[in-house]
UniProtKB/Swiss-Prot annotation:
This is Sensor histidine kinase TmoS. The modification 4-aspartylphosphate is found at D500. Residues 32-103, 611-681 form the PAS domain. The keyword Repeat applies. Member of the two-component regulatory system TmoS/TmoT involved in the regulation of toluene degradation. Probably phosphorylates TmoT via a four-step phosphorelay in response to toluene. Can also be induced by benzene and ethylbenzene. SMART domains: HATPase_c, HisKA, PAC, PAS, REC. Its EC number is 2.7.13.3. Gene3D superfamilies: 1.10.287.130, 3.40.50.2300, Histidine kinase-like ATPase, C-terminal domain (3.30.565.10), PAS domain (3.30.450.20).
Amino acid sequence: MSSLDKRKTQNRSKKNSYSICLKEKASAELKREELARIIFDGLYEFVGLLDAQGNVLEVNQAALNGAGVTLEEIRGKPFWKARWWQISKESVANQKRLVEAASSGEFVRCDIEILGKSGGREVIAVDFSLLPIRDEQENIVFLLAEGRNITDKKKAEAMLALKNHELEQLVERIRKLDNAKSDFFAKVSHELRTPLSLILGPLETIMEAESGRGSPYWKKFEVIQRNAMTLLKQVNTLLDLAKMDAQQMGLSYRRADLSQLTRVISSNFDGIAQQKSITLDAELPPHLIAEVDCEKYERIILNLLSNAFKFTPDGGLIRCHLSLSQPAHALITVSDSGPGIPQNLRKEIFERFHQLNQEGQQANQGTGLGLSIVKEFVELHHGTISVSDAPGGGALFQVKLPLNAPEGAYVANNAMSRSDNPQTVNPDEYLLPIPTAGSGAELPQFQSDQPRVLIVEDNPDMRCFIRDCLSTDYQVYVAPDGAKALELMCSAPPDLLITDLMMPVMSGDTLVHKVREKNEFAHIPIMVLSAKPDEKLRVKLLSESVQDYLLKPFSAHELRARVSNLISMKIAGDALRKELSDQSNDIALLTHRLIKSRHRLQQSNIALTASEARWKAVYENSAAGIVLTDTENRILNANPAFQRITGYTEKDLAQLSMEQLTPPNERTQMKQRLARLLQSGGAEYSVECSYLCKNGSTIWANASVSLMSPRVDEPQVILQIIDDITEKKQAQETLNQLQQELVQVSRSATMGEFAAYIAHEINQPLSAIMTNANAGTRWIGNEPPNIMEAKEALARIIRDSDRAADIIRMVRSFLKRQGPVLKPIDLKALVADTTLILKAPSQSNGVSLNVIAGDTLPAIMGDAVQIQQLVINLAMNSIEAMSQVGCETRQLALSFSSNASNDALIICVKDTGPGIPEDQIGQLFNAFYTTKKEGLGMGLAICLTIAEVHNGKIWAESPPAGGACFFVSIPVS
């Protein structure tokens, strides 16, 4: 017979082809050829071999099954006439063209549809190729056809294209919605500016006409003006955002003195700094001329300073420095002594609508747009902004702006801006109101019997407004957040709690929840005042915990009316509860107990009835057998499933005991387990055992046995649940047999790979035997014969023949077909044989082999041949990995030792190869998983099977220094 010796052609220009030479196959290769055929037919994908004219020679079994044909039907016939291509005439003609192209020497590869599933009735898509194979004279002698099923891939690609199209449509829709939102903001902002102008203008006229701060209405005018200015600032911000989103925001460059601008802006915060005892340090040079948009520069400084004042505690320090930075940039730094900004939030604070939630700060006020506007204004100037830790703690903002406008930009010569006039800059737009005296969390001295009202509101202006509305008729005290309110309520419970929802430290809904958890506050009515139009939350709070919910803005008259109703209901409820508590508590208590006892009895009867119904349903319909026995193991009842499993009828089982259904060799153990169960008083146990059926067969089962709690005056009953696992046991035995056959096949394949090395190892002692035999003949033929030299030659012949015999013994033992034989293993002999096998392949691949075995190795039970196969597989993997890369030093270390507790053998195979990627370590031992270009990916899976047969473990590691380590742990006897 002939075989193909495949090797790459010497002519490098002939890509995607192989050279072959024909030779006579030795009979020793028959078995290997059979194994190769098994592997060929076992391939899942399409593989076929054609002659040079495209006629079928060989096709693997998976491809034949897919088309519903046999090899005999198509062998010797044109490949394009086979069942796979009979989709249409075009498919047949196309395949014929592909075969002709490959026959002319062209490598063909394309995606194509074939009849390759359900016996040729279903079309699948395959990645198809035809590879020309040449002989040593460059003549094409074979065509290798290969195909990989890519139907799922094609479907996934089509689905991905559809999803991408849907995503593009969604992105376009979002873009349109975003543009519509920006247009809406711009239009609404324009519409709001008109009524705000009509509020602020007349208000300013009225305040000028009043007699200064001595007027009784002056404070109310200030509140109106301050909040109107705040609203105007938010409107302007929204308008700026709309312009920036529409890319319509431009810069009006002017030559300005940044020192003067910054000095004027910072001076407007002097009054606020004095109120809060904050030191404002403005370190500015005499002059620093730059070309900037003065209005936007002012907004940058105002936002940074107001942000610093928000988070700086009373008595703190704020620094505002301006300096020249090279090349040609101005550097503005604003730092504070507040809590600072965590590292992980420093990018987020410049995002729109992001607010920094710091404990104790009013995080819920504002829109979260200030720093976003600052960043966008800075970037419009082609500058940068960053945040870091201030030297003494707190936050440090650094803004770097170029001194000169971009080339070609128009720059006005006048350096004036509206910020040059201190009267036009209003920092109140950017700061939270400063709490006035008496507006904090204080417990007043209650002087009368008027109802008490606790107001919880974080905005000082709103807090003062509500207090002024109610202080005439009620004793009012206030708190800025939920935590302070709880403290005040514990000291002086109110008759009514009025709370906002969005507050720092503790929100209003959290406060409501905590108040309702305390029994002493159960009868206190709660009113929510909120600007949050959340209908779902409003309904939830009204249905569960609060008595009223009023949306801002509201009128003072409506507030007084609602408060009056709640206070009246509270007073009436208190009076009624006091009256009821004076009635006969003994009768009420007795009635309550009787009702409760009757209710418990009814519930017990209902539960008992339901439990019995559920038990009956489980008993009759369970797939597992259920048996009730007495303490002597006599069968009292058996459900239909147990009758079906054993083949006995209910009448038959009533005459039997579980002991009679148990095989004789298991009865003693069964009696002992039952005795321990009765002695322990109910400790359930589970066991795998077997039972005798009526037809004489034996079944395997998992049995769970426990004691049932007996009713009064009833005997003890034992519950046994029998789960039939006979089919599972048979499947496991079949699986074990298949695994052993796979191990044997792998062992033969491994020895096939070693054939050349083994031949070399045997040839060496045989050559030495021939040499020494010739020498001995000459010594004996001398006159006189040289007996001493002849004896030494004979001794060397004996030594070399022993060496060859050892190799042959090792090979026969390794290839011996038998199941695993567990017996004590001679580890020293195993190590010696393994070293002998690995010596030749290590040397031929330039690998330094180092085998280390401890002096005292643990005694283990196992199959020595399988353990040796496991180690050889791991070692050959390492040798192959190192030979495929350019390692400077190729070292393979095998170590055999005990673990720390001396109860297991640890085998370590370590190499200096390329190592194993972390994402592949978890998949290495899966069947058919491989990182090689060739191979089935079964080697490491077989190693895992061998380790598990010996109750051991195998795992891989990739050390930081490089290479790979495989560990095997086999427990002692």
